Amino acid sequence: MESLNRMALELADEALEFTEELDIGAFELDTGTTVIDFGVEHDGGLEAGLLLAELQTAGLATVQTRVDTVGDATFPHVEVACDQPAVAMLGAQKAGWELAVDDYEALGSGPARALVATEGEFQAIDYVDAFEFAVLTLESTGLPTTAAASEVAARAGVTEESVFLPTYRTASVAGSVSAAARTVELAVFRLYELGYDPTDVLSASGCAPVAPVAGDEQTAIGRTNDALAHGGRVHLTVAEDFDAFDAVVSSAAARYDDPFAEVVGTDDWDAGDVDNGVFGPAQLTVDVVGGPTHAFGTVREDVLADGFGLS
């Protein structure tokens, strides 16, 4: 397979070429690292969010929007389709890089993770990248520092000038859009956690509503998770059957009936204290090649409306 970071670099170049049209910004740090602002100091938008999601999946997923409803309200929805879901979602899109350098904190996703490849899922998908450039998207309230960029370069094994850092707040249009593009990722990662071979997922598609942009990060985290857990729908075509497909959907979690903001409760919540079942799509359909078709879960528009603050 082509290098994930090579494919993502082409998308980063596209972002740099169309910064004005996408309402994003770009600059170089003193280290030579390129920072692309998708939604920290710049507004970004739907198209910026779609490109951000493509960057996070290293171009292996088709990401687009359509208009649909949540209750009686109209919302854009993000659709994702992918024929390499194990590599695209677990090897790139998963937010598995916790970056903390001095006072700067961010959650990293994207193909630079595959240059490090120390997370367990890389062994499961049998993929490690080797490339001279690294693309890591950062979910953070601030733009990256030179020290943070140097840390990324050191861990990825590339020069600081070869690092590209698309950055965004959860509470931004691009943040809401890219979060809605994580339906398939949640399903594939949940299957991996449950012991299913992720490479047996042959193709995948999903959709979820784009959460209203919140005024603060905590509310944004709640709304974007609600969009997935109560509004996300996923279809998988798989090679092998499994007796725990039903545990993938969010309704398997103990507090399924509550908006995410009520599940986490406080500003200092820890994801490690939350039932993993919450981080799943609302509905899952699985087609087993040569076998049965399974369907689990349901969309909960009532919980979505509550979490989105619809009136």
Swiss-Prot record:
Concerning its family, UniProt says: Belongs to the MCH family.
> What are the recorded Gene Ontology BP terms?
one-carbon metabolic process
The record ties this protein, via Gene3D superfamilies, to: Methenyltetrahydromethanopterin Cyclohydrolase, Chain A, domain 1, Methenyltetrahydromethanopterin Cyclohydrolase, Chain A, domain 2
Chemical reaction(s) catalysed? 5,10-methenyl-5,6,7,8-tetrahydromethanopterin + H2O = N(5)-formyl-5,6,7,8-tetrahydromethanopterin + H(+)
Give the subcellular location: Cytoplasm
* A GO-annotated cellular component: cytoplasm
- Major enzyme class: hydrolase
CDD domains registered for this protein in UniProt: MCH
Instruction: Quote the EC number.
Output: 3.5.4.27
HAMAP family in UniProt: McH (MF_00486)
SUPFAM superfamilies in the record, alphabetically? Methenyltetrahydromethanopterin cyclohydrolase
A single Gene Ontology molecular function, please?
Answer: methenyltetrahydromethanopterin cyclohydrolase activity
Question: Any idea which UniProt keywords this protein has?
Answer: Cytoplasm, Hydrolase, One-carbon metabolism
A Pfam family that this protein carries is MCH
Protein name as it appears in the record: Methenyltetrahydromethanopterin cyclohydrolase
Q: What does this protein do?
A: Catalyzes the hydrolysis of methenyl-H(4)MPT(+) to 5-formyl-H(4)MPT.
